[in-house]
């Protein structure tokens, strides 16, 4: 117990205010980090603020590893590097480091050092309620920032309910799949059979013009014939290659059509839903909640010849006779025997695009 009149503050978190202090944040940080203390500094946040009369102030939050007993009221004094001037702060122990951190964040002109330390008082944040914490998270600019807010203001929820929080924030801050940009102009595909061109004109279009039950198409042909690049050049689409990922990060319900590329038909989940352009169906995921698929769009199935790839060979299997009868009513089957482009056309287009990107 200190004697009456003796200066003493013992705390893990210190809140310092320097009135009429014209030091830069960087200079103040350098001086604070060089102060020798028996317990390590873990986090420092500095805010430079201009009051209405134009005078600059500095607010500083310091978090120590353990409680630091300050008995020298001049210990945190700062000095000007350019003139004979000392800056003496108001020194307080910060009961809620989150409240102080939020307060000095308000003007935005801040500088941080170290890692902010979350504790029980920070979680309560003074009068901070759970609703306030989650409201601040929703208003954050990104999922990572929202997680940081919840970790700081609601650490119990962060630890006990992280899976649900993480999943929900994926939806709140959903980033639509980046639109595909074809490396070739559509005009470079100058060897496309009329059957394919006709199918595109009847089925690949936006929702307003699309048939209620569009027809899908299976295109079989050798590798390097341009099947994939042609199929992906027709408009906004979902591209599923090797396996099906219907998560929101990959699959968009606003696409005009699907492209399913190089998926063994023996293991193709939702065969009928895709080929039949079915509407409003669900896909059950192994570790998550069912995904609702809007559907109603055609699918281009791309495959090579062979028993583990060809849809025709798969449907010709005796056990799949009923499925074959259904498939022929919901899709057309086209086999291509030559590239969908002339070599010179593709090369010329590629060179032109490279030149345009370099210009």
Swiss-Prot record:
Divalent metal cations, possibly Mg(2+) or Mn(2+). Pfam families: Gemini_AL1, Gemini_AL1_M. Its main location: host cell. Keywords: ATP-binding, Covalent protein-DNA linkage, DNA replication, DNA-binding, Endonuclease, Helicase, Host nucleus, Host-virus interaction, Hydrolase, Metal-binding, Multifunctional enzyme, Nuclease, Nucleotide-binding, Nucleotidyltransferase, Transferase. Residues 8-116 form the CRESS-DNA virus Rep endonuclease domain. A motif (RCR-2) lies at residues 57-59. A divalent metal cation binds at residues 49, 57, 59, 107. InterPro entries: CRESS_DNA_REP, Gemini_AL1_CLV, Gemini_AL1_REP, Gemini_AL1_REP_central. It comes from the Viruses. GO terms for biological process: DNA replication. PROSITE patterns: CRESS_DNA_REP. Its EC number is 2.7.7.-, 3.1.21.-. ATP binds at residues 221-228. A motif (RCR-3) lies at residues 103-106. It is found in: Host nucleus. GO terms for cellular component: host cell nucleus. Residues 143-153 are annotated as: Binding to RBR1. The keyword Oxidoreductase does not apply. Changing residue 103 to F: Complete loss of replication, DNA cleavage and nucleotidyl transfer activity. One of its GO terms (molecular function) is endodeoxyribonuclease activity, producing 5'-phosphomonoesters. A motif (RCR-1) lies at residues 15-18. Belongs to the geminiviridae Rep protein family. Essential for the replication of viral ssDNA. The closed circular ssDNA genome is first converted to a superhelical dsDNA. Rep binds a specific region at the genome origin of replication. It introduces an endonucleolytic nick within the conserved sequence 5'-TAATATTAC-3' in the intergenic region of the genome present in all geminiviruses, thereby initiating the rolling circle replication (RCR). Following cleavage, binds covalently to the 5'-phosphate of DNA as a tyrosyl ester. The cleavage gives rise to a free 3'-OH that serves as a primer for the cellular DNA polymerase. There are 3 rolling circle replication (RCR) motifs. RCR-2 is probably involved in metal coordination. RCR-3 is required for phosphodiester bond cleavage for initiation of RCR. Homooligomer. Interacts with the replication enhancer protein (REn). Interacts with host retinoblastoma-related protein 1 (RBR1), and may thereby induce the transcription of host replicative enzymes even if the cell is not dividing anymore. Interacts with host PCNA. Interacts with host SCE1 protein. This is Replication-associated protein. It comes from Tomato yellow leaf curl Sardinia virus (TYLCSV). The lineage of its organism: Viruses, Monodnaviria, Shotokuvirae, Cressdnaviricota, Repensiviricetes.
């Amino acid at each position: 117990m200190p004697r009456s009149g003796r200066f003493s503050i013992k705390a893990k978190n210190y809140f310092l205010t320097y009135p009429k202090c014209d030091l830069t944040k960087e200079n103040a940080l350098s001086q604070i980090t060089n102060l020798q203390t028996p317990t390590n500094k873990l986090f420092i946040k500095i805010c430079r603020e201009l009051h209405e009369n134009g005078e600059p102030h500095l607010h500083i939050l310091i978090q120590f590893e353990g409680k630091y007993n300050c008995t020298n009221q001049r210990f945190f004094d700062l000095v000007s590097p350019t003139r004979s001037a000392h800056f003496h702060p108001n020194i307080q122990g910060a009961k809620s480091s989150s409240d102080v951190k939020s307060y000095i964040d308000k003007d935005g002109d801040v500088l941080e050092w170290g890692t902010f330390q979350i504790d029980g008082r920070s979680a309560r944040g003074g009068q901070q309620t759970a609703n306030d914490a989650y409201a601040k998270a929703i208003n954050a600019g990104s999922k990572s920032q929202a997680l940081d807010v919840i970790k700081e203001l609601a650490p119990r929820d962060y630890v006990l309910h992280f899976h649900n929080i993480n999943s929900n924030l994926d939806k709140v801050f959903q980033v639509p799949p980046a639109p595909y940009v074809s490396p070739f102009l559509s005009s470079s595909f100058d060897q496309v059979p009329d059957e394919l061109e006709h199918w595109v004109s009847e089925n690949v279009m936006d929702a307003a013009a699309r048939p209620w039950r569009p027809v899908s198409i299976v295109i079989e042909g050798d590798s390097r014939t341009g099947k994939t690049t042609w199929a992906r050049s027709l408009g906004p689409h979902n591209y599923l290659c090797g396996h099906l990922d219907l998560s929101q990060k990959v699959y968009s319900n606003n696409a005009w059509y699907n492209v399913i590329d190089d998926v063994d038909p023996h293991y193709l989940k939702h065969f009928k839903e895709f080929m039949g352009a079915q509407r409003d169906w669900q896909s059950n995921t192994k570790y998550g909640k069912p995904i609702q698929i809007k559907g109603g769009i055609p699918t281009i199935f791309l495959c090579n010849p062979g028993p583990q790839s060809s849809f025709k060979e798969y449907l010709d299997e005796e056990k799949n006779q009923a499925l074959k009868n259904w498939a022929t009513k919901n899709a057309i089957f086209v086999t291509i025997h030559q590239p969908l482009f002339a070599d010179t056309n593709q090369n010329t287009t590629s060179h032109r695009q490279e030149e345009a990107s370099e210009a």
